[in-house]
Amino acid sequence: MPSSNGPMTGTRDKLSNSPRERGMSPPQRAIQEYDEGQKVHLRIDPSVREGRFHPRFNGHTGEVTGKQGRAFKIKIIDGGKEKTLIARPAHLRAQE
């Protein structure tokens, strides 16, 4: 049987928490608000299924351009090309 080519292939390490971070993620992370123009780091929280972006962009840094429902629109540069991702706040971390 041929191997799958779905969007989650090769994510064993990307979508696994370290032992300290296992279990339920903090609820305040899921309701975090970000301002337009604020820089955020994209980091998938494996314990939250909804509002994820494609794992290819895990580890990127982008800029919040707006809101879409409960999620945020994030502008990133990928290979010299501007792209817009939509992700919920559970998968975003503010840049200090």
UniProtKB/Swiss-Prot annotation:
PROSITE patterns in UniProt:
RIBOSOMAL_L21E
Record-level GO cellular component terms: ribonucleoprotein complex; ribosome
Entry keyword Methyltransferase: no
Give any single GO term for biological process. translation
- Residue spans of biased composition, Basic and acidic residues class: 11-23
SUPFAM superfamilies documented for this protein: Translation proteins SH3-like domain
Write down the superkingdom of origin. Archaea
Which cysteines link up through disulfide bonds? none
**Database matches in InterPro entries:** Ribosomal_eL21, Ribosomal_eL21_arc, Ribosomal_eL21_CS, Ribosomal_eL21_sf, Translation_prot_SH3-like_sf
**Which protein family is it in?**
Belongs to the eukaryotic ribosomal protein eL21 family.
Protein name listed in UniProt: Large ribosomal subunit protein eL21
Specify the species. Answer: Haloquadratum walsbyi (strain DSM 16790 / HBSQ001)
Taxonomic lineage of this organism?
A: Archaea, Methanobacteriati, Methanobacteriota, Stenosarchaea group, Halobacteria
